[in-house]
Swiss-Prot record:
Keywords: Cell inner membrane, Cell membrane, Cell wall biogenesis/degradation, Lipid transport, Membrane, Phosphoprotein, Transmembrane, Transmembrane helix, Transport, Virulence. One of its GO terms (biological process) is lipid transport. It comes from Mycobacterium tuberculosis (strain ATCC 25618 / H37Rv). Disruption phenotype: Disruption causes altered colony morphology. Inactivation increases mouse survival. Mutants are unable to liberate PDIM into the culture medium and are compromised for growth in mouse lungs, but not in the liver or spleen. DIM are found mostly in the cytosol and plasma membrane, and mutants exhibit higher cell wall permeability and are more sensitive to detergent. The lineage of its organism: Bacteria, Bacillati, Actinomycetota, Actinomycetes, Mycobacteriales. GO terms for molecular function: fatty acid transmembrane transporter activity. The gene is mmpL7. One of its GO terms (cellular component) is plasma membrane. It is found in: Cell inner membrane. This is Phthiocerol dimycocerosate exporter MmpL7. Interacts with PpsE.
């Protein structure tokens, strides 16, 4: 049973009119028609299987997968460490787990006044209400404590920090940004005020984003160039159609495969990956077709090559590209991982080159026009002309000079914030560092704030850090009012006020002397008066006693007489109808006056008793008066002796108090704005309403976590990666004792992003180096160690030279540093197109040598056969430059390196490889 392209072993290429440059070759078969049917059916089944696989795969993708969401940025890796840090920050402070930061900026024509705050508050409130697109808002300007951090130097702008939904550099973040800007546009206008959103470049920058029509344009141009290369190599239009059909089937199968591998996490580089996959697929299949044509041309009049003989030609381009792109699925940088995703398309193209491409060629039939050799030495033949060693050395020297700018290369992660509008109103780098400290205890007490102050001091000492916003430094700098030196200044003011009140006190003390003398005279007069009164009272008491005795005697006699008359009184009371009885009436007239006398005597006696009691009390009071007057005289004497001492003491204390007040005031002035005044915030100040906003925004809801924002100088580049470890070390040093012992430190923001990018780039650089060494080892196995080393050095030298020229162009001429992902992505694309160009040339030359013993002068050269990969790589790079519109984008930078690198690669191939001896 023949192979999927079993008919190929019976096809013979017959040269027609060998001397004519326009000759064509036709297919003839050495077998009978009956022997032809089974292989033809097999080839049809192969083609049908590919078509069915493409249709089924796309249908399954359509009905089983939801619409893909762009949740992965092109540069920021999402490793476990980053995810854990983001999760801890979001858990402590809900809504702030995103690294998509924006700033609300309210600008006025003049200095903002309190009457402008309602418009600012309305903008903040509107953003907080849009919970679908806004995670959290940190208000600065409305709080007097934090207002200095959110106010521009000229006082015309007020700022608030906004966390958007979605990760930086993703479509979700871009949609959130558009939404919040729309919210601000819907605010009622305020005269003289304008609200806008300022974002760091990393928030909304999607450097690898290509639109669908741009991708289609690049792929279409690549397909046209591939067809032109096929026609220039004297291949038929039918052969070009077979190449395009094979590429279409490969892409139709590769697209669902890539979707399955990547799932819903497409990322901003998905279209970029598909474009690269399409270009590499077209280039791979075109190169395989041209290599197969070269093999047939080299066969000459000998037996036609079998499928086994053609297998290296069909497999070599795809295998070389797949070896370099497939392992990039292990890359951590999303953009470079996207190149690995494009490698999936190359794997499918390799499979198509081994199956459906030979089948379509076989199905072309005997009447189809197939590859024929070119005559003469065309441009592909000239690529293989030997050159001198002097030329190789000269090329090496030029390459070394081109590499020199790499020495001063700067790695950028985002655009320089100083070039962004509104950057002058921000406290520092538009993307701050975030340090979250998680403790097992409540940190909302004076001791914990002292520890937070120590951490803030440590962090601001880290190189590049300008300001640190924390619960202890709410304005980004040491809080002067929350210090012992500031308290000393307030105490000095109080002492100064009290010292001024001592002068009237001394005057009053001096006047007390005369007052005491007057009081002493009055006491003497009182003493004399009391003595006279006491003597008079005693004399009156002597006259009162006989009167009281006589009154009591009269009362007694009256009582005794009443007892005698009681019988008569009782008879009168009990007599019936006394008024009509003469005797009873007469007795009653006698008794009634006497009763009146008895009643009067009783009242007289009672009054006498009261006079006696009052007299007794008066005598008792008057008797104690001399003693009380004596006590008053003694107290006055003590006061008289104390007043001079008090006057002397106050006069002596006044200079000391003034001196202490001056010393405390000078102490406060000397430590003002130094941050070394001894931080202290009392519990009363912690509970004060003026600190409420800081307490709520800088501590977690349970108080066990606090966050610090660090604003640094300069731009976000890979140099900031070192700051992440410095921040952890600095915070750890301040937490060896005190309230933050054994607390957990989490670093996020700019430093964490730079560190994650740096680690991912290092990992991916090592991965690319391993891949390159693997390719070199395989090339050495095919053609010898010298040729293998030449391939590796050639690709590396071409890349470094192109990178150096690009650095000179972008960094030194245009003042734009290369984005951090440009070197690796451009190297991956360059190597994917360049390594097959070099390796396939060596291998194709060996195949030709083994087939004929010598290369046919009229055949397409081995390097010329794989020229489509290099040419289409150049088309891809130039397309990236064009679709970026000539801007300073990452696509332009990648395209520049790729185009220059491929140009240098061709030069290196001409200068080095022909002079390199090979192993036979």
């Amino acid at each position: 049973m023949p192979s999927p392209a079993g008919r190929l072993h019976r096809i013979r290429y017959i040269r027609l009119k060998k001397s004519s440059p326009d000759c064509r070759a036709t297919i003839t078969s050495g077998s009978a028609d009956g022997q032809r049917r089974s292989p033809r059916l097999t080839n049809l089944l192969v083609v049908a299987a590919w078509v069915a696989a493409a249709v089924i795969a796309n249908l399954l993708l359509t009905f089983t997968q939801a619409e893909p969401h762009d949740t992965s940025p092109a540069l920021l890796p999402q490793d476990a460490k980053t995810a854990a840090a983001t999760s801890r920050i979001a858990q402590a402070f809900p809504g702030t787990g995103s690294n998509a930061i924006a700033y609300l900026v309210v600008e006025g024509g003049s200095t903002l006044e309190p009457q402008d705050q309602p418009y600012y508050d309305a903008a903040v409130g509107a953003l907080r209400a849009d919970t679908r697109h806004v995670g959290s808002v940190l208000d600065w300007w409305s709080d007097p404590v934090t207002a200095p951090l959110g106010t521009s130097p000229d006082g015309r702008s007020a700022t608030a920090m906004v966390w958007l939904r979605g990760e930086a550099g993703t479509t979700q973040a871009a949609e959130s940004l558009d939404a919040v800007r729309s919210v601000l546009r819907q605010l009622p206008p305020s005269e003289g005020l304008r609200a806008s959103i300022v974002v760091p470049a990393i928030t909304n920058d999607m450097p690898m984003q290509i639109t669908a029509w741009q991708s289609a344009t690049i792929v279409t141009v690549a397909a046209v160039i591939a067809v032109l290369l096929l026609l220039r190599a004297r291949l038929s239009v039918r052969a070009a159609a077979i190449v395009l059909l094979t590429a279409d089937l490969s892409l139709a199968v590769a697209w669902p495969l890539a979707a399955v591998v990547r799932g819903h996490d497409w990322g901003t580089d998905s279209v970029f990956s598909w474009t690269l996959a399409a270009v590499l697929t077209i280039g791979t299949i075109t190169a395989a077709t041209m290599l197969a044509a070269r093999l047939g041309s080299d066969a000459g009049h000998s037996a036609a090559p079998t499928y086994r003989d053609s297998l290296p030609a069909f497999a070599l381009p795809g295998a070389c590209v797949a070896i370099f792109t497939g392992p990039l699925l292990l890359a951590r940088t999303p953009a470079l991982h996207g190149v690995g995703t494009a490698g999936l398309g190359v794997f499918v193209a390799l499979a198509a080159s081994l199956t459906v491409l030979p089948a379509l060629i076989a199905l072309a039939g005997a009447s189809r026009q197939l590859p024929a050799p070119t005559t003469g030495a065309g441009w592909t033949g000239r690529l293989s002309l030997p050159v001198s060693s002097a030329s190789a050395l000269g090329t090496a020297a030029v390459l070394a000079i081109c590499m020199l700018p790499i020495i001063g290369m700067r790695w950028g992660v985002a655009e320089n914030p100083t070039r962004q509008g509104g950057a002058q109103v921000l406290p520092g780098n538009a993307l701050p560092d975030v340090v979250v400290i998680k403790s097992a205890r409540d940190l909302r007490d004076p001791a914990a704030l002292i520890a937070i102050n120590q951490v803030s001091h440590r962090l601001v000492e880290v190189p590049g850090v300008r300001k640190v916003e924390s619960a202890a430094w709410p304005a980004g700098v040491p809080w002067t009012d929350a210090s012992l030196s500031s308290a000393a200044g307030r105490l000095a003011d109080q002492l100064g006020q009290q010292a001024g009140s001592f002068v009237p006190a001394v005057t009053a003390i001096k006047s007390m002397k005369s007052i005491i003398e007057q009081m002493s005279g009055a006491v003497d007069q009182l003493d004399s008066t009391v003595n006279v009164t006491l003597a008079g009272a005693r004399q009156a008491q002597q006259y009162l006693d006989p009167m009281l005795a006589a009154a009591r005697n009269l009362k007694n006699k009256t009582t005794e007489l009443s007892e005698y008359l009681e019988t008569i009184h009782t008879w009168i009371v009990g007599f019936t109808n006394c008024p009509d009885d003469v005797l009873c009436t007469a007795m009653r007239k006698v008794i009634e006056p006497y009763d009146i006398v008895v009643t009067g005597m009783n009242e007289l006696s009672t009054g006498a008793d009261r006079i006696s009691a009052i007299s007794t009390q008066t005598m008792s009071a008057l008797s104690s008066a001399p003693r009380m007057v004596a006590q008053m005289r003694s107290a006055l004497a003590q006061v008289r002796s104390f007043v001079p001492k008090l006057e002397t003491t106050i006069q002596d204390a006044m200079p000391q108090i003034a001196q202490a007040s001056a010393m405390l005031k000078n102490l406060s002035a000397d430590f003002a704005d130094t941050g070394e005044g001894g931080f202290h915030l009392s519990r009363k100040d912690l509970a004060d309403p003026s600190y409420r906003h800081v307490r709520e925004s800088m501590f977690s809801s349970d108080g066990t976590a606090t966050r610090l924002f660090l604003y640094s100088d300069g731009q976000l580049d890979l140099a900031a990666a070192a700051r992440a470890q410095q921040l952890e070390i600095a915070a750890g040093k301040a937490m060896k004792y005190g309230s933050l012992v054994d607390s957990q430190v989490t670093v996020g923001g700019a430093a964490q992003i730079a560190a994650a990018v740096r680690d991912a780039l290092i990992h991916d650089a090592v991965l690319l180096a391993v891949i390159l060494l693997t390719v070199v080892a395989l090339a050495s196995m095919w053609r010898g160690a010298v040729h293998g080393a030449a391939v590796g050095v050639g690709v590396l030298a071409s890349y470094l030279a192109a990178l150096g020229v690009s650095i000179a162009l972008w960094q030194h001429l245009l003042d734009r540093e290369l984005n951090a992902l440009v070197p690796l992505v451009s190297f991956a694309v360059l190597a994917s197109c360049g390594v097959p160009y070099l390796v396939a040339g060596i291998k194709a030359g060996r195949i030709a040598d083994e087939a004929t013993g010598a290369r046919s002068k009229g055949a397409v050269s081995g390097r010329g056969a794989v020229a489509p990969l290099a040419a289409l790589g150049g088309v891809f790079g130039a397309g990236l430059v064009l679709v970026s519109g000539g801007s300073f984008s990452v696509l332009s930078q990648i395209g520049t390196v790729v185009v220059l690198g491929l140009g240098v690669l061709i030069t290196v191939q001409r200068a080095w490889l022909p002079t390199t001896p090979g192993r036979r």
